[in-house]
């Protein structure tokens, strides 16, 4: 049985709650000693993992809608993507304000360049910023065919973000490996599309070099 528009609306409400509740928990944990011995790192990792969860959920929607024959599920994809960006912004903000501190924000640019895992993180965030800014139907109409080309960069984020996570932890634990494995699986479900994109980019690069 296919989902109705009303059911999808309620699903969106549930997904908004799923995006908001972790923030409420984090606020509670900060104020009631619910974090570990290094609360700054805990906040950074929590916000980063939550952003990654929403990224994976966003990537899950298209294959799930296709294989489950639930086309209306696609309507939830933008919502999940925006929550991914929101949590990624919290993640970046927590690093800038809590790790570096307000008085050392001038060092942020240097940190992002000299630490490779931070470079991957900021590249991912900039891409998510562009995708969030252009996620409306008005922007889709304005950009035309270029809209899909831009939003294909989400697949690059799906590669860079798990690497950023793996690189950022001092001791490799199962958790970042699980996230990386899920990202690989979700990308593998799109191997035909990704192969087509790769061949197109290679052809364009070859044509430019031939000029």
UniProtKB/Swiss-Prot annotation:
Coiled coil: none annotated. It is found in: Cell inner membrane. Pfam families: Ferric_reduct (PF01794). Binds 1 FMN per subunit. The chain crosses the membrane at residues 17-37, 82-102, 116-136, 153-173, 178-198. One of its GO terms (molecular function) is FMN binding. Keywords: Cell inner membrane, Cell membrane, Electron transport, Flavoprotein, FMN, Heme, Iron, Membrane, Metal-binding, Transmembrane, Transmembrane helix, Transport. It comes from the Bacteria. The keyword Nucleus does not apply. It is a multi-pass membrane protein. One of its GO terms (cellular component) is plasma membrane. The keyword Signal does not apply. One of its GO terms (biological process) is protein repair. Its cofactor is FMN; heme b. Belongs to the MsrQ family. PANTHER family: PROTEIN-METHIONINE-SULFOXIDE REDUCTASE HEME-BINDING SUBUNIT MSRQ. NCBIfam families: PRK05419.1-1, PRK05419.1-2, PRK05419.1-4. Heterodimer of a catalytic subunit (MsrP) and a heme-binding subunit (MsrQ). This is Protein-methionine-sulfoxide reductase heme-binding subunit MsrQ. It comes from Shigella boydii serotype 4 (strain Sb227). The gene is msrQ.
């Amino acid at each position: 049985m296919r989902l109705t528009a009303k059911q999808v609306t309620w699903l969106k409400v549930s997904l908004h709650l799923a995006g908001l509740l972790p923030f409420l928990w984090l606020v509670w944990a900060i104020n009631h000693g619910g974090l570990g011995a290094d609360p700054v790192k805990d906040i950074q990792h929590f916000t980063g993992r939550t952003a990654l969860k929403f990224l994976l959920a966003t990537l899950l929607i298209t294959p799930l809608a296709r294989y489950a024959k639930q086309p209306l599920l696609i309507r939830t994809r933008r919502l999940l993507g925006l929550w991914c960006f929101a949590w990624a912004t919290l993640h970046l903000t927590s690093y800038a304000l809590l790790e570096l501190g307000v008085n050392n924000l001038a060092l942020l640019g240097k940190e992002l360049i000299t630490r490779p895992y931070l470079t991957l993180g900021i590249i991912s965030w900039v891409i998510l910023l562009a995708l969030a800014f252009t996620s409306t139907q008005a922007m889709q109409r304005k950009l035309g065919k270029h809209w899909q080309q831009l939003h294909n960069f989400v697949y690059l984020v799906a590669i860079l973000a798990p690497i950023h996570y793996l690189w950022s932890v001092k001791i490799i634990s199962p958790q970042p490996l699980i996230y990386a494995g899920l990202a690989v699986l979700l990308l593998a479900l799109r191997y035909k599309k990704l192969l087509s994109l790769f061949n197109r980019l290679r052809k364009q690069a070859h044509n430019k070099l031939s000029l």
